[in-house]
Amino acid sequence: MTAQVLVAQHVVAGYAPGLPIVQDASVEVGPGEIVTIVGPNGAGKSTLLKAIAGEVLFESGTILLDGRDVAGLPAHEMVRCGIGFVPQTGNVFTNLTVAENLVVGGHILPRAELKRRLARAYELTPFLGERRASTGRLLSGGQRQILAVARALMTDPKVIMLDEPTAGLAPRAAGEVFAHLRRLAGTGVAVLMVEQNAKAAIRASDRFYVLAQGRNRMQGRPQDLADDTAIGEAFLGRGKASS
């Protein structure tokens, strides 16, 4: 069995000491795999990603990246360790060109390495190369999200995490984002995302987790689902908590 790139176990995290939003959540993702976390509003999905990325208060649990314990490291150290994080807004600078946005993502790189990774970004996502001189405001919503992903990839992460990458997008644009993530996973990058559109996201994934009330309620593979009943129960917190 291929070793998992990211293993987070029994994570407790939040925004203030003693007030955890994530109360006991676990997730794993392997190389070239797309894993999605779904659940109701307030379940702790985004907070779990931010805890792994070092952006909120980590209270307890284990986070291993290629076997190395990185739990509790600050965000800038997580980037250096190999975690890329795309927040819900994408944070594309609409006044900057596509090329300038990518340079921002790789600002810590030596000049020669930055040039090499720009070329790789354009190879993986040809339309970015074609529109490298266009500003972010001229891109569609789906294209901006793909640019945000490409920018996070400039540091060559082992795993890329995305917080609701299709939020606010029309179904066609959302499908383009999911298709891009599948191509990305095909290069060996581990993909972990949080999504509100559970049905579409699960279909686009290799595995999924359902969180409710800050805890794991269900996990599985899309092909194992006979219908939506079990997921609905898990959303309501009726599923058996699992690690």
Model regions: which residues?
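ABC ATPase C-loop
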Residues: A152-L153
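Catalytic Walker B motif of ABC-type/P-loop ATPase nucleotide-binding domains
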Residues: I160-E164
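Conserved ABC ATPase signature
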Residues: T135-L139
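ABC-type ATPase nucleotide-binding domains, specifically the catalytic core motifs of the NBD
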Residues: A16-P17, V98-R116, L124-G129, A133, ...
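A short, flexible loop at the N-terminus of ABC-type nucleotide-binding domains that lies
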Residues: M1-A8, V12-D24, P31, T36, ...
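The feature captures the beta-strand-to-loop junction immediately N-terminal to the Walker
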Residues: V38-P40
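Conserved ABC transporter NBD signature motif
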Residues: G61-R68, C81, L114-L118, G220
